Amino acid sequence: MATVEELKLRIRELENELIKSKQKQSDAEHNIRPKIEQMSAEVVDSNPYSRLMALKRMGIVQDYEKIRSFAVAVVGVGGVGSVTAEMLTRCGIGKLLLFDYDKVELANMNRLFFQPHQAGLSKVEAAQHTLRNINPDVAFETHNYNITTMDNFTHFMDRVSHGGLEEGKPVDLILSCVDNFEARMAINTACNELGQIWMESGVSENAVSGHIQLIIPGETACFACAPPLVVAANIDEKTLKRDGVCAASLPTTMGVVAGLLVQNVLKYLLGFGTVSYYLGYNAMQDFFPSMAMKANPQCDDRHCRRQQDEYKKKEAERPKQEVVQEEEEVVHEDNEWGIELVSEVTEAELQDASGPIPDLPEGITVAYTIPEKDGGSGETVEETEQSLEELMAQMKKI
């Protein structure tokens, strides 16, 4: 007699077969354009790449065709992940690996990409079907499972390390578009162990803010270096969920965060512009904070600490480049009249008005110092027995 796990596996296989048969039927009904072997800059209505190739003509990107040589893994095909996958597909990425265990629901329709008739299908298969119709030149690989389980995590690590555009090579980038901290920590652990560069993204529970973050193992802070409170406190986030209560979701915020993420991906892969290490988005004030976070030497992830040690060794071995200071150009070489600028404050007065410089961490300076209090400045006028009239008479004589 078959076990429960075997039955579940068989059900999953049958569901995937049903999805594939529906896709074949749908593909036959729809007219999918033939594959394009080489990107062209020719401006004609039938060329889907003409406006992308215009970036090369305008001097933004040197070699846009290079995008076809990259493989990107997208983990989480929800509000942010599905739009991210769509944008990368339209940009002509070489290969997309999609990971998600969830199914399309009518509750997802407030977000972008998915359509009502896809309800009940797995998100990865529904996404692959739609994306292949958009751009058949892109190679797709889908995995319908939860990466946080032991067996699936092992398979996930195997695919991101061997599922590149050329089989056996690693992917070029992993994009985290998941909506829970457990999955983020799983991706973080895998990338630290493999030394894989990845980008993390997220939208707040109230749907009016979000962020993207580039994580380079050993060089920048990983997700475990500065974890959210729910992770640092070892709280099981499943206990925080309540029946009948869900997080808010806006397609506008999802679209903005997905756009910022893909823009950063393109800049990183194609080498143009400035790649953001961390970029936040606050929709209430239209505020976009940007920063870079250093790796935590006391990080709980041992693979992160190992990557930090390897990065420090590489930096120490790298030859230091001498910085040549340019001499300031003299505006007026001749000073016929011998004019000089003289300060109104002497050096002694300046020292008296300044205080000691405090001991501060490296990189921090003070704008000014506070002078020490003079012990004699607190002296008061001696008391006198003279009357007010006598004092006024003395002042008149002065």
From Swiss-Prot:
Motif UFM1-interacting sequence (UIS): chain residues: 330-342
Location of region: Linker: 343-373
Pfam family, one: ThiF
Entry annotation: catalytic residues: C246
Placement of sequence motif UFC1-binding sequence (UFC): 383-398
Binding site for Zn(2+): C222, C225, C299, C304
Annotated GO MF terms: ATP binding; protein homodimerization activity; UFM1 activating enzyme activity; zinc ion binding
Assembly and oligomerization: Homodimer; homodimerization is required for ufm1 activation. Interacts (via UIS motif) with ufm1; binds ufm1 via a trans-binding mechanism in which ufm1 interacts with distinct sites in both subunits of the uba5 homodimer. Interacts (via C-terminus) with ufc1.
Protein name (record): Ubiquitin-like modifier-activating enzyme 5
Species of the source: Danio rerio (Zebrafish)
